[in-house]
């Protein structure tokens, strides 16, 4: 068969469809595609979508997440050629195709932080008569990598595609087919930031001769394994379209898409500057191009500007400070030496990896500035998108750290000594733009040269990295180090801490006076973040000589206290009754110092969970998105006071602070029996994905913030098996009786493979098979409804029915004898196409009829040859002859029965009126009264007989009908009272009793022997 020769190369284990101008539905209820006449078509035998037709695409929502995006978000279409829309209000759009081809069409979209992937929406749109078009694929390394040249000749149905290929390709196909085998798309990295180059590759078990990538940003590539640079942040869903060496067209999507993040960092987070103490001194920071970000303060800072980068030469400058000697501490373990003020010039420094480092300048002599007076932070490069891996070790040197910075992968590995943790901590994200002030102490603040000073700190969270800088250019990574200063001077130490939630913590102990230099009082508050009515521990640490001065402490809430500590350290408590930002200010003699406390009544975070798709296929990767969960405290305004307690404004709670940031989440998925099917935890809100078996599930999301607030939500979702789609064609389209008809399944399963097929050919023949091609012959012309039912491995099914016309005419009839010689004839002739318009009956007895269904009566018994001749409106004729036998009616015998009654003594009346004859009448009644008297024959059913003596008599009635057929009936009658309880036994019965008794006797004797 010609069709079979074309189809055989296309029969593979995957799902293949011969294609022609229709929609192949992979994801139902995701889109509506109509041609310019408003027609939506899934029938491959109808070419509804033509080249140059204006086709309308409408996005539909298969679940609630998609509905939210379509209603309130933005949508982007990928038409499967080299065309796609931007993100926008494109719920409905139009597109025109310029040559016949099977195109994968998909839409994607997003709302807030939640995206909807092309992998969840795509279907195939077959444009034009693809099955009957000749395709020439001409690949060359000389062709463009980013576009194709397509030549379409509609006269001879030829498409020539010229495209880039690493090796020359010259292949021809008579038609293309769609193969729903999945193509796996892979990318080279997880964390992608604008400006990053991403490597793509795909995998499929086919020999690919053509591929085209869509990167989702309007650019394309015909390389098999391209590299692409994303220049703008956003959500992108790449797609690859491939054709193999058998002309099978396949598509693959990156399920989760690519989130290209906006770089964030390269700015100054001002804590005490740039203006210090109302303009007494200033701090300035510039990059190597002279740009700043921003030396006017946090209100002007742009955290997305990336002004200060890795390996850039950054200039640090200050002005207006008191003191004779000045120095810089850059926070990364590097300091400048003290320089006399007349020679102090701007300092330059290079940072080697993205990080948020504290930096300070200090002075002493004729006035001094401490680290607590000048603390600010420089956020170097893209800290937001860098992941930090911490590798603590008790074997590492205690005085320095090592690092590895992988710019391409946005990772920093830190290797250092630790005595607080021993296991690595991976994928930590620093919370830039905020820090936590912690208590740091020294057991002595004035010592001799080389005298031991023991330092300690009280981290807010669980520390994973502790770095002490002692102010003399040396460091330690112990939590409570002991240090000796080798020369006299005034030293300003600090401790830098990172906790397991990525919080930056800094503690500044009092200055250390060495070799005759004096230290100064320092005040601390712990905790610096607390709810109302929580006792705040306030500690004064100072040299012994200062403990005898009166200290005036202002709490910022209008209250203050005078204290003469008389010892160091000295601790007392204070409680705040309302929310606010409160400075705790200490004035003692010529020294002053201040700490800030944030008092907030924490509001629990809001847990939000999006699950999509829902319902999902068992082949789908289900996305769980908690990223729209939020902490209502973020950016909430709380009062801010000066140290006198005067309201000076309102402070927006930083989204990166523990007060207003979700610190982590836990997702637990339960099956329908309540068993845990999956559990996942993270300290970062991120979309996670997983596939599940078919079933009903409940997902519970728990989120928590940095203040201990917890909230949860549950969402139900289901995983289903989408049924296969039944479709078939047959050849020839108008077969004749007994001609071989080839049926070809075009069915497909959007999730896998067809398990088996059931064909019902409409003529009583049904077959069950795993073959995609079957053959059948029809014996008679006519209209037959052929039904194909397909099943997948889960026994889900779908059916499609088509009518097949078997051409020709066939005369036939049935008949029924409705009484002795009358016959009803029924015409069962068929013709296709057309209809029968005349009937001629020859009944074989010289009679005829032109009725379609006549009734005829024969005059006598016999065998008759009945012939029916029919004629159609297409001038086809046919005849059929059958033998009709007219038989005499059957004769039924009579039925004998009677009753009797004793009239007087031994006189009995017998009544045979119960006897009857179905097809006639009874002529004679013959009575044998059982007393030896001669039989009595009569035509009267009633007769009287007198017995000579009492006794039991067998009375037999024989009846004879008009056809001389007979029947008999015998009854025992009892005559006389003396025989009521004693019935005489006939002699033959007595003989049988004697014989049986003798037989039993002998059997007993044999048993005894």
UniProtKB/Swiss-Prot annotation:
InterPro entries: Ig-like_fold, PIP_CTERM, PKD/Chitinase_dom, PKD_dom, PKD_dom_sf
Membrane topology: Multi-pass membrane protein
Localization: Cell membrane
Record field: transmembrane: 6-26, 985-1005
Ranges for domain PKD: 213-247, 436-503, 724-806, 822-886, 925-962
Keywords: Cell membrane, Membrane, Repeat, Transmembrane, Transmembrane helix
CDD domains: PKD (cd00146)
NCBIfam families: PIP_CTERM
Superkingdom per UniProt: Archaea
GO cellular component: plasma membrane
Name of the featured protein: Uncharacterized protein MJ1468
Main location: membrane
SUPFAM superfamilies linked to this entry: PKD domain
Organism: Methanocaldococcus jannaschii (strain ATCC 43067 / DSM 2661 / JAL-1 / JCM 10045 / NBRC 100440)
């Amino acid at each position: 068969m010609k069709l079979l020769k074309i189809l055989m190369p296309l029969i593979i284990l995957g799902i293949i469809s011969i294609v022609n101008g229709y929609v192949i539905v992979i994801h139902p209820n995701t889109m509506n595609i109509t041609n310019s006449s408003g027609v939506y078509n899934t029938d491959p035998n109808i070419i509804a979508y033509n080249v140059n037709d204006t086709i309308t695409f409408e996005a539909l929502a298969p679940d609630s997440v998609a509905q939210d995006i379509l209603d309130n978000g933005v949508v982007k279409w990928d038409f499967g050629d080299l065309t796609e829309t931007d993100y926008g209000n494109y719920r409905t759009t139009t597109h025109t195709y310029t040559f016949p081809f099977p195109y994968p069409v998909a839409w994607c979209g997003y709302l807030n932080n939640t995206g909807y992937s092309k992998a969840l929406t795509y279907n195939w749109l077959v444009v034009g008569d693809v099955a009957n078009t000749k395709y020439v694929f001409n690949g060359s390394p000389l062709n463009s990598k980013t576009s194709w040249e397509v030549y379409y000749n509609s006269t001879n149905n030829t498409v020539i595609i010229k495209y880039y290929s690493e090796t020359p390709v010259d292949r021809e196909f008579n038609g293309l087919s769609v193969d729903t085998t999945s193509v796996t798309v892979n990318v080279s990295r997880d964390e992608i930031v604008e400006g990053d180059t991403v490597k793509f590759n795909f995998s499929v078990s086919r020999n690919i001769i053509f591929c085209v990538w869509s990167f989702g940003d309007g650019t394309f590539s015909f390389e098999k394994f391209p590299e692409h640079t994303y220049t703008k942040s956003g959500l992108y869903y790449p797609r690859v379209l491939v054709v193999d060496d058998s002309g099978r067209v396949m598509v693959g999507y990156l399920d989760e898409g690519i989130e290209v993040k906006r770089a964030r960092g390269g700015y100054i987070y001002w804590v005490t500057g740039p203006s210090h103490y109302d303009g007494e001194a200033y701090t300035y920071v510039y990059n190597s191009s002279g740009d700043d970000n921003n030396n006017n303060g946090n209100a002007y800072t742009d955290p997305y500007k990336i002004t200060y980068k890795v390996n850039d030469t950054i200039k640090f400058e200050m002005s207006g400070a008191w003191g004779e000697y000045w120095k810089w501490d850059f926070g990364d373990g590097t300091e400048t030496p003290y320089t006399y003020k007349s020679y102090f010039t701007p300092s330059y420094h290079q940072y080697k990896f993205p990080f948020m480092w504290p930096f300070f300048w200090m002075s002493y002599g004729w006035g001094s500035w401490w680290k607590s007076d000048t603390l600010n932070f420089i956020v170097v490069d893209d800290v937001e998108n860098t992941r930090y891996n911490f590798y603590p070790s008790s074997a590492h040197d205690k005085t320095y750290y090592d690092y590895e910075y992988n710019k391409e992968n946005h990772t920093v590995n830190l290797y250092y000594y630790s005595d607080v943790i021993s296991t690595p901590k991976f994928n930590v994200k620093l919370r830039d733009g905020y820090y936590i002030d912690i208590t740091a102490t020294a057991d002595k603040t004035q010592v001799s040269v080389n005298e031991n000073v023991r330092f300690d700190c009280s981290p807010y969270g669980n520390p994973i990295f502790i770095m002490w800088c002692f102010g003399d250019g040396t460091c330690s990574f112990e939590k409570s180090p002991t240090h000796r200063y080798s020369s006299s001077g005034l030293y300003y130490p600090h401790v830098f801490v990172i906790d397991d939630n990525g919080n930056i913590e800094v503690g500044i102990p009092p200055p250390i006076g060495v070799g005759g230099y004096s230290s100064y009082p320092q005040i601390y508050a712990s905790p610096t973040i607390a709810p109302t009515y929580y006792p705040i521990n306030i500690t004064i640490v100072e040299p012994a000589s200062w403990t005898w001065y009166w200290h005036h402490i202002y709490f910022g809430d209008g209250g203050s206290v005078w204290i003469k500590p008389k010892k160091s350290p000295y601790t007392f408590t204070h409680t705040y009754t309302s929310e606010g930002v409160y400075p705790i200010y200490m004035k003692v003699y010529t020294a002053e110092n201040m700490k800030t406390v944030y008092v907030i009544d924490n509001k629990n975070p809001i847990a939000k969970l999006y699950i999509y798709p829902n319902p999902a296929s068992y082949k789908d990767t289900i996305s769980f998105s908690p990223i729209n969960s939020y902490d209502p405290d973020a950016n909430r305004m709380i009062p801010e006071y000066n140290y006198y307690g005067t309201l000076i404004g309102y402070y927006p709670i930083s989204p990166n602070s523990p007060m207003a940031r979700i610190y982590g989440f836990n997702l637990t998925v339960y099956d329908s029996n309540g068993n845990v099917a999956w559990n996942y935890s993270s300290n970062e809100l991120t979309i996670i994905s997983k596939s599940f078996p078919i079933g009903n599930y409940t997902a519970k999301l728990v989120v928590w913030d940095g203040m201990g607030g917890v909230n949860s939500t549950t969402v139900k979702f289901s995983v289903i098996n989408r049924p296969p789609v039944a479709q078939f064609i047959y050849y020839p389209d108008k077969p004749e009786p007994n001609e071989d008809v080839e049926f070809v399944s075009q069915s497909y399963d959007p999730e896998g493979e067809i398990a088996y097929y059931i064909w019902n050919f409409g003529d009583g023949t049904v077959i069950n098979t795993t073959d995609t091609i079957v053959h059948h012959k029809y014996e008679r012309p006519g209209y037959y409804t052929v039904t194909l039912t397909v099943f997948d491995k889960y026994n889900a099914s779908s059916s499609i029915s088509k009518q097949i016309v078997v051409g020709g005419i066939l005369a036939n009839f049935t008949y029924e004898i409705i009484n002795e010689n009358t016959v009803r004839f029924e015409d069962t002739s068929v013709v296709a196409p057309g209809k029968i318009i005349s009937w001629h009956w020859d009944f074989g007895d010289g009679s005829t009829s032109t009725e379609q269904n006549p009734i005829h009566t024969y005059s006598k018994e016999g065998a008759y040859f009945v012939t029916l001749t029919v004629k159609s409106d297409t001038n086809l004729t046919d005849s059929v002859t059958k033998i009709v036998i007219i038989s005499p009616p059957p004769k039924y015998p009579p039925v004998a029965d009677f009753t009797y009654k004793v009239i007087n003594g031994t006189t009995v009346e017998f009544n045979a009126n119960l006897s009857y004859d179905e097809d006639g009448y009874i002529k004679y009644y013959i009575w044998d009264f059982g007393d030896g008297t001669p039989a009595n024959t009569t035509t009267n059913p009633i007769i009287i007989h007198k017995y000579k003596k009492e006794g039991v008599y067998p009375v037999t009635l024989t009846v004879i009908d008009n056809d001389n057929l007979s029947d008999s009936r015998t009854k025992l009658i009892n005559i006389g009272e003396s025989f009521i309880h004693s019935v005489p036994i006939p002699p033959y019965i007595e003989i049988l009793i004697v014989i049986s008794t003798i037989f039993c006797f002998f059997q007993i004797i044999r048993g005894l022997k």
